[in-house]
Structure formats: C-alpha cells, structure tokens
C-alpha cells in the first residue's frame, strides 16, 4: 500500500471510530435511544457508552440476531430523540420467511443523495427522468430511486412488481407462471419507455435487465445509464451486461439491502477481470469479511468469507449482523480507503434454500 493510500486508510478509520462513539452515545442514552437498545443494555448489564469507544469495541456486543427484526412492535426501534417525526417502515424481500422491518425517516434519502455523488452527470444527466424496473410495495428501494431521481432533477416512473409472488411461484415449481409475471413487468417497462422520451436512466435487477434487453435496444430508447442491483451480479453477468445487454451504456452495479443502504462499486478496471468490488458507505455502514467458522476473525485478503454488516445511523443501529452473503475480502482503494467485498454471492453455509426470484 502506498503512503498516500495508507494515510487515507488511517483517516477513514479515525472517522469511523468517531462516528461509532456518536452513534453509540445516541442509541444507548436514555434521553435519545430506542426502547430496544435501552432494554438490551440492561439485559447485558453493560454500560455500552463507556465500553464502546471505537469500531473494534463493537466486539464487546453480541452479534445482531436476524429474528430481532422479524415481527414485534416496530416502534421499539424508534429512538426517543426522533419521536414525532414522520416515519416509514420498510421490509426486506421476504425470501427467507417473515420479512425483516426497518423504521426510517431520512436514512434512505441521505444514502441515495450520497450515492448520487458517485454518478456521472454525462451518463446519468441531471434533469433526466428514470425508469424504476424493480420491486415495489413495502420496500425502501422504490422510494429511494424516486428520491434519487428527484434529487437529480428528474421524475421516476415505476412498474408494479411484487417479488414475493415470483418466489411463491418458484417454490411451487410454477416456472411458466413466474416467467409470465416477469414478462408482465417487462411489458410495463416497455409501455413507460415508449411514452416518456425523457427517460435516460434506469434501475433494474440483472434478470429483468436481461429480459428487457431481449425485447429492445436500450440505447435506441435513449438510455445512457443503468444502475443495477441484485444477487446475480457475477463477473460473467457483469461482462455480459457491458458487452451484450447494454454496450455503450454506463453500467453501475451496486450491492445493498434494506438494512445496510447501498454499497458503491470500485470504478471499473479491466484488470479486475469483471469482478465487482463493493465498498460500504462508511461511516454510515461498515462491512467486514469474516471466517465462516469464526465470525470474530477476518479472512485474509483474497479469501472468501461471510459478509458481516454494521449499520451506524441515528435512525438504525445494527452491530455485527451476519448476512446471508459471502464475498472475497478485497483491500482498500483510492476512492474508498477501507476494505471491499468482491464477487458477492449467497452464503453457501446456511443450509437453507434461498429463492431469489426476480433478483
């Protein structure tokens, strides 16, 4: 690592440590914290504000449990310091049982305004409209893309898409029904594109991008930038998208979910062999790649491990959550001087079948 990057890494770590202190102070202070974390602090018999002074101190807390967000009174997650504000409740996809829920006020706006700074104004031109070809319903993504479009001076046009119906079809083995529903969503997108020539940008998933590109030449319809997220963003698909599905169009892959927000990708470099390397939006969220057998230990660079997420905002504190994804641990880079996650895929060690549907 060169000295300039090493200095950036150190500064980023100091910023993360300071942010951890601020967020822990907020969530575990009786005047501002939420009932859930204040009760947990009593249960642990731990003065969290005293014990957690930097990011590494979060190891003193147990891993965040998946089931904590599944059901239960959702207001237990509302910090007292934010009471009285208009709220949203967003759900995860529900591909592994009861959906997880997250209360939000402004986090989705902040996350996507920050993400907007990484987009090219040439290929995602300000003032242009967007097509949202992705999940609707109780997911944060639809409102987030809408806000991203508005933040950049445009309007977002959305299809009506229920991924849970697709998952039900696939679990029942009804592939034909699932494909009909996918075509129904693509038909909606085609109708929107034909009626709105100011659409230059779009969000979609790998499977839906492929289905749409089979029907039309996206560049001929004026699309100049594609923001793509989902579980099928392999190096093979990445190359296929750039060379076959959307040649000449700026292809921007992301990794994200309702709990984290979204991670941006390291700028495209042919030497990466089309591997997509993501970097979390520190200090608001941090990702570590840990050993599948010992989550207290990071794997060496270049090795595959399980993704461990920590979310650090005033609206949401999620420490050391073991995601259902695996990735290759990658080193810091100039734009993002902290660890990256390469070639993210569903984690192989869960022992449960995960149906991804339209993603």
Tell where the protein language model's regions lie, with residue ranges.
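Short, conserved acidic/polar surface loops in the N-terminal third of protein domains
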Residues: 101-105, 141-144, 169-170
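Glycine-centered flexibility sites
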Residues: 33, 45, 93-97, 142, ...
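Nucleotide 5′-phosphate-binding alpha/beta core
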Residues: 1-91, 97-129, 134-138, 151, ...
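Surface-exposed charge patches
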Residues: 39, 147, 239
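Conserved short alpha-helical elements in the N-terminal third of ANL/AMP-binding
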Residues: 142-156
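Active-site glycine/GP-rich loop and adjacent strand/helix microenvironment
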Residues: 1-26, 152-359
